[in-house]
């Protein structure tokens, strides 16, 4: 498994803030991968009416289910390809060798619930279920989708896959693009100007 933490929004950056290659049994790989992603995730406080609500870059349930899915449904007969985790400023991408059910090609698909719950590796799936690492009764993609239900459409998970690889992208719920920051700061400055002008002032006060 290759785990990479990039500076920026793509792999064109010359700076990798963290880079690890991990081996071991599937349970250890699962734990190490989840820990790697959570370690490089941020947490914050969202203001509510009376207090604050703690929020994270990614719903932890979504991370756990996406990681488990990559291990449980990987095509282990496809040599020369490894499971990859790439963390960028605004998202985490988890790539696994092996197609979706029926080899259907998907590009930027947000309809996770349409994915057929097909088990490529029955024994691995059963082991994860016995160890309470996954549920038999509820598909992982359904839980991933549900964990993002409070967020806007542009933050919803995306699936890309073809006949050889399957990739799920989870977007950082705390990320603010430069445009968002400009808009946010601009609105704050606008409100300050309105507040200043709403109160009568002398020429001297305005000059200062």
Language-model features, listed with the residues they occupy:
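C-terminal regulatory or interaction extensions
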Residues: 1-208
């Amino acid at each position: 498994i290759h785990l990479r933490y990039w500076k920026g929004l793509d792999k064109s950056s010359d700076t990798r803030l963290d880079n690890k290659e991990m081996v071991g049994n599937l349970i250890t790989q699962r734990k190490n991968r989840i820990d790697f992603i959570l370690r490089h995730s941020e947490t914050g406080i969202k203001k509510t009416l009376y207090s604050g609500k703690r929020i994270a870059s990614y719903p932890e349930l979504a991370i756990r289910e996406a990681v488990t899915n990559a291990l449980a449904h990987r095509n282990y007969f496809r040599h020369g390809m490894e499971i990859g985790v790439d963390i960028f400023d605004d998202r985490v991408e988890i790539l696994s060798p092996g197609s979706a059910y029926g080899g259907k090609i998907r590009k930027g698909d947000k309809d996770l619930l349409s994915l057929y719950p097909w088990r490529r590796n029955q024994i691995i799936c059963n082991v994860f279920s016995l160890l309470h690492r996954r549920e038999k009764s509820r598909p992982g993609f359904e839980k991933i989708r549900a964990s993002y239900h409070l967020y806007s459409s542009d933050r919803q998970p995306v699936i890309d896959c073809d006949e050889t690889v399957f990739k799920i992208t989870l977007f950082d719920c705390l990320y603010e693009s430069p445009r968002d920051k400009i808009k946010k700061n601009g609105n704050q400055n606008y409100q300050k100007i309105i507040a200043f002008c709403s109160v009568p002032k002398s020429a001297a006060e305005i000059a200062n």
